[in-house]
Design a protein with these regions (language model features):
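Short glycine/threonine-rich turn/loop motifs
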Residues: 50-155, 217-327, 358-364
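Active-site lining segments that contact anionic ligands and/or coordinate catalytic metals
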Residues: 286-289, 332-334, 342-345
Length: 364
Protein backbone atom coordinates (compact mmCIF):
# COMPACT_ATOMS: atom_id res chain seq x y z
CA UNK A 1 0.00 0.00 0.00
CA UNK A 2 2.82 2.36 0.89
CA UNK A 3 4.52 1.52 -2.41
CA UNK A 4 1.31 2.41 -4.28
CA UNK A 5 1.15 5.86 -2.67
CA UNK A 6 4.86 6.35 -3.33
CA UNK A 7 4.46 5.74 -7.08
CA UNK A 8 1.41 8.02 -7.19
CA UNK A 9 3.46 10.72 -5.51
CA UNK A 10 6.33 10.34 -7.98
CA UNK A 11 3.95 10.34 -10.95
CA UNK A 12 2.23 13.49 -9.70
CA UNK A 13 5.59 15.23 -9.28
CA UNK A 14 6.66 14.34 -12.82
CA UNK A 15 3.32 15.47 -14.19
CA UNK A 16 3.63 18.83 -12.46
CA UNK A 17 7.20 19.20 -13.72
CA UNK A 18 6.16 18.45 -17.29
CA UNK A 19 3.32 20.95 -17.10
CA UNK A 20 5.75 23.54 -15.78
CA UNK A 21 8.07 22.92 -18.74
CA UNK A 22 5.17 23.32 -21.14
CA UNK A 23 4.08 26.71 -19.79
CA UNK A 24 3.87 28.94 -22.90
CA UNK A 25 6.25 31.90 -23.13
CA UNK A 26 5.03 35.03 -24.85
CA UNK A 27 7.45 37.04 -26.95
CA UNK A 28 8.73 37.71 -30.44
CA UNK A 29 9.10 34.51 -32.46
CA UNK A 30 10.38 36.12 -35.68
CA UNK A 31 14.09 35.30 -35.98
CA UNK A 32 14.59 38.28 -38.29
CA UNK A 33 13.31 40.76 -35.71
CA UNK A 34 15.63 42.83 -33.55
CA UNK A 35 14.02 41.59 -30.33
CA UNK A 36 13.67 37.91 -31.35
CA UNK A 37 13.25 35.63 -28.31
CA UNK A 38 14.36 32.05 -29.11
CA UNK A 39 12.57 30.81 -25.98
CA UNK A 40 9.19 32.26 -26.95
CA UNK A 41 6.47 29.85 -28.07
CA UNK A 42 3.64 32.35 -28.56
CA UNK A 43 4.14 35.47 -30.64
CA UNK A 44 2.75 38.42 -28.69
CA UNK A 45 3.01 40.91 -31.53
CA UNK A 46 6.00 42.69 -30.02
CA UNK A 47 8.42 41.99 -32.90
CA UNK A 48 10.38 45.01 -34.06
CA UNK A 49 11.45 45.15 -37.68
CA UNK A 50 14.99 46.26 -38.45
CA UNK A 51 15.34 49.98 -38.99
CA UNK A 52 18.03 52.50 -38.12
CA UNK A 53 18.02 56.22 -37.56
CA UNK A 54 20.36 58.21 -39.81
CA UNK A 55 23.04 60.27 -38.09
CA UNK A 56 23.17 63.67 -39.74
CA UNK A 57 26.74 64.77 -40.44
CA UNK A 58 26.55 68.58 -40.25
CA UNK A 59 27.21 70.70 -43.31
CA UNK A 60 29.99 73.10 -42.33
CA UNK A 61 30.81 76.34 -44.15
CA UNK A 62 34.24 76.06 -45.73
CA UNK A 63 34.35 72.26 -45.43
CA UNK A 64 33.75 70.00 -48.44
CA UNK A 65 30.96 67.44 -48.23
CA UNK A 66 32.03 64.38 -46.29
CA UNK A 67 32.08 61.27 -48.49
CA UNK A 68 30.24 58.45 -46.71
CA UNK A 69 30.73 54.91 -48.09
CA UNK A 70 27.52 53.56 -49.63
CA UNK A 71 27.99 50.27 -47.78
CA UNK A 72 28.39 51.98 -44.40
CA UNK A 73 25.89 54.82 -43.94
CA UNK A 74 26.25 56.64 -40.65
CA UNK A 75 23.44 55.80 -38.22
CA UNK A 76 22.76 56.69 -34.61
CA UNK A 77 22.81 52.99 -33.72
CA UNK A 78 26.12 52.47 -35.53
CA UNK A 79 27.72 55.50 -33.89
CA UNK A 80 26.63 54.39 -30.40
CA UNK A 81 28.06 50.93 -31.04
CA UNK A 82 31.26 52.34 -32.54
CA UNK A 83 31.87 54.59 -29.55
CA UNK A 84 31.41 51.65 -27.17
CA UNK A 85 33.88 49.55 -29.16
CA UNK A 86 36.34 52.47 -29.33
CA UNK A 87 36.36 52.69 -25.54
CA UNK A 88 36.30 48.96 -24.78
CA UNK A 89 39.52 46.97 -24.14
CA UNK A 90 37.67 43.83 -25.22
CA UNK A 91 39.29 44.28 -28.64
CA UNK A 92 42.78 43.64 -27.26
CA UNK A 93 44.20 40.18 -26.58
CA UNK A 94 44.33 40.59 -22.79
CA UNK A 95 41.42 43.04 -22.37
CA UNK A 96 43.69 45.86 -21.18
CA UNK A 97 44.00 48.21 -24.18
CA UNK A 98 41.30 50.17 -26.00
CA UNK A 99 41.47 52.60 -28.93
CA UNK A 100 40.91 55.45 -26.47
CA UNK A 101 44.20 54.64 -24.68
CA UNK A 102 46.22 55.82 -27.69
CA UNK A 103 43.68 58.40 -28.87
CA UNK A 104 42.74 60.28 -25.72
CA UNK A 105 39.92 62.79 -25.94
CA UNK A 106 41.59 65.50 -23.84
CA UNK A 107 44.46 65.52 -26.35
CA UNK A 108 42.13 65.77 -29.35
CA UNK A 109 42.11 61.98 -29.62
CA UNK A 110 45.91 61.76 -29.80
CA UNK A 111 48.58 60.44 -27.42
CA UNK A 112 50.75 62.75 -25.27
CA UNK A 113 53.49 60.10 -25.34
CA UNK A 114 56.03 60.18 -28.14
CA UNK A 115 55.11 56.59 -28.95
CA UNK A 116 52.11 54.62 -27.76
CA UNK A 117 52.54 51.41 -25.79
CA UNK A 118 50.85 48.14 -26.76
CA UNK A 119 49.63 45.40 -24.43
CA UNK A 120 53.12 43.93 -24.11
CA UNK A 121 54.49 47.28 -22.94
CA UNK A 122 56.39 47.65 -26.20
CA UNK A 123 56.50 51.12 -27.73
CA UNK A 124 55.42 51.65 -31.30
CA UNK A 125 57.53 53.46 -33.87
CA UNK A 126 55.25 56.37 -34.77
CA UNK A 127 53.26 59.03 -32.95
CA UNK A 128 49.53 58.31 -32.72
CA UNK A 129 47.67 60.57 -35.13
CA UNK A 130 44.98 62.88 -33.78
CA UNK A 131 41.48 61.77 -34.77
CA UNK A 132 39.95 65.07 -35.73
CA UNK A 133 37.83 65.71 -38.83
CA UNK A 134 39.08 62.36 -40.16
CA UNK A 135 35.89 61.90 -42.16
CA UNK A 136 37.40 64.30 -44.70
CA UNK A 137 40.70 62.44 -45.05
CA UNK A 138 41.52 60.64 -48.29
CA UNK A 139 44.07 58.30 -46.70
CA UNK A 140 45.08 57.28 -43.21
CA UNK A 141 48.17 56.62 -41.11
CA UNK A 142 51.32 58.69 -41.49
CA UNK A 143 52.33 56.62 -44.52
CA UNK A 144 48.90 56.46 -46.18
CA UNK A 145 48.74 52.69 -45.79
CA UNK A 146 44.94 52.73 -45.40
CA UNK A 147 42.47 54.20 -47.87
CA UNK A 148 39.43 54.37 -45.60
CA UNK A 149 38.55 54.59 -41.93
CA UNK A 150 37.17 51.07 -42.17
CA UNK A 151 40.45 49.75 -43.57
CA UNK A 152 42.48 51.63 -40.98
CA UNK A 153 40.47 50.17 -38.08
CA UNK A 154 41.50 46.62 -39.03
CA UNK A 155 45.21 47.11 -38.38
CA UNK A 156 45.59 47.98 -34.66
CA UNK A 157 43.72 44.83 -33.58
CA UNK A 158 46.34 42.45 -34.99
CA UNK A 159 49.43 44.68 -34.72
CA UNK A 160 51.81 43.03 -32.19
CA UNK A 161 52.87 46.51 -31.05
CA UNK A 162 49.28 47.47 -30.29
CA UNK A 163 46.40 45.13 -29.37
CA UNK A 164 48.22 41.97 -30.48
CA UNK A 165 44.98 40.08 -31.04
CA UNK A 166 43.41 37.95 -33.76
CA UNK A 167 40.11 38.70 -35.39
CA UNK A 168 38.97 35.17 -34.63
CA UNK A 169 39.44 35.85 -30.93
CA UNK A 170 37.72 39.25 -31.16
CA UNK A 171 34.71 37.75 -32.91
CA UNK A 172 34.47 34.96 -30.35
CA UNK A 173 34.51 37.39 -27.42
CA UNK A 174 31.94 39.71 -28.96
CA UNK A 175 29.60 36.88 -29.95
CA UNK A 176 29.67 35.62 -26.36
CA UNK A 177 28.61 39.06 -25.11
CA UNK A 178 24.83 39.48 -25.10
CA UNK A 179 24.98 43.27 -24.93
CA UNK A 180 27.11 43.41 -28.06
CA UNK A 181 24.87 40.85 -29.77
CA UNK A 182 21.92 43.18 -29.24
CA UNK A 183 23.80 46.33 -30.27
CA UNK A 184 25.06 44.77 -33.51
CA UNK A 185 21.55 43.50 -34.23
CA UNK A 186 20.19 47.02 -33.78
CA UNK A 187 22.92 48.64 -35.89
CA UNK A 188 23.36 46.11 -38.69
CA UNK A 189 20.63 43.46 -38.28
CA UNK A 190 23.18 40.65 -38.00
CA UNK A 191 23.11 37.63 -35.71
CA UNK A 192 26.82 36.77 -35.99
CA UNK A 193 29.31 39.55 -35.26
CA UNK A 194 32.21 39.66 -37.71
CA UNK A 195 35.27 41.84 -38.21
CA UNK A 196 33.76 43.78 -41.13
CA UNK A 197 30.94 45.09 -38.98
CA UNK A 198 33.26 45.85 -36.07
CA UNK A 199 35.36 48.21 -38.20
CA UNK A 200 32.25 49.68 -39.81
CA UNK A 201 30.91 50.68 -36.41
CA UNK A 202 34.23 52.18 -35.30
CA UNK A 203 34.50 54.12 -38.57
CA UNK A 204 30.99 55.50 -38.12
CA UNK A 205 31.91 56.83 -34.69
CA UNK A 206 35.18 58.34 -35.93
CA UNK A 207 33.33 60.26 -38.65
CA UNK A 208 31.45 62.12 -35.92
CA UNK A 209 34.67 63.51 -34.39
CA UNK A 210 34.21 66.94 -35.92
CA UNK A 211 35.85 70.16 -34.77
CA UNK A 212 34.75 73.54 -36.09
CA UNK A 213 34.18 75.71 -33.01
CA UNK A 214 37.61 77.24 -32.44
CA UNK A 215 38.28 80.90 -31.80
CA UNK A 216 39.35 81.24 -35.42
CA UNK A 217 36.05 79.74 -36.61
CA UNK A 218 34.21 82.33 -34.53
CA UNK A 219 36.43 85.04 -36.02
CA UNK A 220 35.51 83.92 -39.54
CA UNK A 221 31.83 84.15 -38.58
CA UNK A 222 32.36 87.71 -37.35
CA UNK A 223 31.51 86.77 -33.77
CA UNK A 224 34.81 87.83 -32.18
CA UNK A 225 38.04 89.64 -33.03
CA UNK A 226 41.58 88.31 -32.94
CA UNK A 227 44.20 90.00 -30.80
CA UNK A 228 46.86 91.99 -32.62
CA UNK A 229 49.40 89.23 -32.04
CA UNK A 230 47.00 86.56 -33.33
CA UNK A 231 46.16 88.64 -36.40
CA UNK A 232 49.85 89.22 -37.12
CA UNK A 233 50.39 85.46 -36.89
CA UNK A 234 47.47 84.91 -39.25
CA UNK A 235 49.12 87.19 -41.79
CA UNK A 236 52.48 85.41 -41.43
CA UNK A 237 50.80 82.00 -41.79
CA UNK A 238 49.21 82.98 -45.09
CA UNK A 239 52.23 84.71 -46.60
CA UNK A 240 55.41 83.47 -48.26
CA UNK A 241 57.21 84.70 -45.17
CA UNK A 242 55.62 82.00 -43.04
CA UNK A 243 55.10 79.52 -45.89
CA UNK A 244 52.51 77.57 -43.86
CA UNK A 245 49.50 77.94 -46.13
CA UNK A 246 50.91 75.77 -48.92
CA UNK A 247 50.34 72.56 -46.94
CA UNK A 248 47.90 73.77 -44.31
CA UNK A 249 45.59 76.04 -46.28
CA UNK A 250 41.78 75.90 -46.45
CA UNK A 251 39.53 75.49 -43.43
CA UNK A 252 40.70 71.90 -43.05
CA UNK A 253 44.27 73.13 -42.38
CA UNK A 254 45.69 70.19 -44.33
CA UNK A 255 46.06 69.28 -47.98
CA UNK A 256 45.49 65.49 -47.84
CA UNK A 257 48.92 65.04 -49.43
CA UNK A 258 52.35 63.73 -48.43
CA UNK A 259 55.51 65.79 -48.04
CA UNK A 260 59.12 65.45 -47.03
CA UNK A 261 59.44 68.50 -44.82
CA UNK A 262 63.17 68.29 -44.25
CA UNK A 263 63.26 66.30 -41.02
CA UNK A 264 66.11 63.94 -41.96
CA UNK A 265 68.96 63.35 -44.33
CA UNK A 266 69.37 60.10 -46.23
CA UNK A 267 69.33 57.19 -45.62
CA UNK A 268 65.91 57.53 -43.99
CA UNK A 269 65.24 55.52 -40.87
CA UNK A 270 61.53 55.58 -41.76
CA UNK A 271 60.66 55.59 -45.46
CA UNK A 272 57.09 56.76 -44.85
CA UNK A 273 55.02 56.79 -48.04
CA UNK A 274 57.92 55.23 -49.95
CA UNK A 275 57.57 51.99 -48.01
CA UNK A 276 53.98 51.70 -49.23
CA UNK A 277 54.48 52.74 -52.86
CA UNK A 278 58.01 51.37 -53.41
CA UNK A 279 58.75 54.58 -55.29
CA UNK A 280 62.10 56.13 -54.41
CA UNK A 281 60.84 59.69 -54.79
CA UNK A 282 58.24 59.00 -52.07
CA UNK A 283 60.86 58.13 -49.47
CA UNK A 284 60.72 60.37 -46.40
CA UNK A 285 57.25 61.68 -47.21
CA UNK A 286 54.54 61.70 -44.56
CA UNK A 287 50.90 62.72 -44.47
CA UNK A 288 50.14 66.35 -43.70
CA UNK A 289 48.31 66.52 -40.36
CA UNK A 290 45.60 69.07 -39.69
CA UNK A 291 46.65 72.03 -37.57
CA UNK A 292 43.26 72.19 -35.89
CA UNK A 293 43.71 71.60 -32.15
CA UNK A 294 47.48 71.57 -32.66
CA UNK A 295 47.83 73.05 -29.17
CA UNK A 296 46.51 69.78 -27.70
CA UNK A 297 48.34 67.23 -29.84
CA UNK A 298 52.01 67.43 -28.80
CA UNK A 299 54.45 65.86 -29.44
CA UNK A 300 54.71 66.65 -33.13
CA UNK A 301 55.75 65.01 -36.42
CA UNK A 302 55.39 61.34 -37.36
CA UNK A 303 57.93 60.31 -34.73
CA UNK A 304 56.98 62.83 -32.05
CA UNK A 305 60.46 64.36 -32.11
CA UNK A 306 59.30 67.89 -31.24
CA UNK A 307 57.76 68.46 -27.82
CA UNK A 308 56.56 72.03 -28.34
CA UNK A 309 55.22 74.32 -31.03
CA UNK A 310 58.30 76.47 -30.48
CA UNK A 311 60.48 73.55 -31.59
CA UNK A 312 58.32 73.00 -34.66
CA UNK A 313 58.58 76.65 -35.70
CA UNK A 314 62.33 76.60 -35.12
CA UNK A 315 62.67 73.58 -37.42
CA UNK A 316 61.14 75.53 -40.29
CA UNK A 317 62.93 78.70 -39.27
CA UNK A 318 66.28 76.94 -39.59
CA UNK A 319 65.50 75.50 -43.01
CA UNK A 320 65.41 71.81 -42.18
CA UNK A 321 67.70 69.13 -43.59
CA UNK A 322 68.51 68.37 -47.20
CA UNK A 323 67.63 65.12 -48.96
CA UNK A 324 66.95 64.15 -52.56
CA UNK A 325 63.19 63.98 -51.91
CA UNK A 326 62.78 67.14 -49.85
CA UNK A 327 59.58 68.89 -50.88
CA UNK A 328 59.80 71.79 -53.37
CA UNK A 329 57.47 73.72 -51.05
CA UNK A 330 60.36 73.93 -48.61
CA UNK A 331 61.59 76.84 -50.72
CA UNK A 332 63.77 78.23 -48.01
CA UNK A 333 65.40 74.86 -47.32
CA UNK A 334 68.93 75.48 -46.13
CA UNK A 335 68.15 79.11 -45.34
CA UNK A 336 64.99 79.00 -43.28
CA UNK A 337 62.14 81.40 -42.71
CA UNK A 338 64.28 83.85 -40.74
CA UNK A 339 61.38 84.89 -38.53
CA UNK A 340 62.08 87.27 -35.68
CA UNK A 341 61.33 86.22 -32.11
CA UNK A 342 58.18 88.35 -32.12
CA UNK A 343 57.02 86.85 -35.42
CA UNK A 344 57.44 83.35 -33.98
CA UNK A 345 55.42 84.38 -30.92
CA UNK A 346 52.70 85.82 -33.16
CA UNK A 347 52.58 82.71 -35.35
CA UNK A 348 52.12 80.44 -32.33
CA UNK A 349 49.45 82.78 -30.96
CA UNK A 350 47.54 82.34 -34.22
CA UNK A 351 47.96 78.55 -34.20
CA UNK A 352 46.37 78.47 -30.76
CA UNK A 353 43.26 80.17 -32.14
CA UNK A 354 42.63 76.84 -33.90
CA UNK A 355 41.98 75.18 -30.53
CA UNK A 356 38.44 73.89 -30.07
CA UNK A 357 37.84 73.40 -26.35
CA UNK A 358 34.30 72.17 -26.94
CA UNK A 359 35.72 69.27 -28.94
CA UNK A 360 37.81 67.96 -26.06
CA UNK A 361 35.35 68.80 -23.28
CA UNK A 362 31.95 67.95 -24.79
CA UNK A 363 30.55 64.72 -23.36
CA UNK A 364 28.07 64.17 -26.19
Amino acid sequence: MKEKYFFILIFSFLLISCKKDLIPINGCTDSNAINYNPNASIDDGSCLNFSTNPYQIPSIVGFPLMKIPENNPTTIEGVILGEKLFNDPILSADNTLACINCHQKEFSFSDPNQFSFGIQGIAGNRQSSALINVGWNNSFNWDGSANSLEEQAFEPITNPLEMNNTWQNVEEKLNNNQEYKQLFKQAFNIDYIDSNHVVKAIAQFERTLISNESKFDKYLKGEILLTQSEFNGYAIFNSEKGDCFHCHGTNMFMDNLFHNNGLDTEPFQDLGLGKITNIQSDNGKFKTPTLRNIEFTAPYMHDGRFSTLEEVIEHYNSGGKYSSTVDPLMKKQGVGLQLSNQEKIDLIAYLKTLSDYNFIEDNN
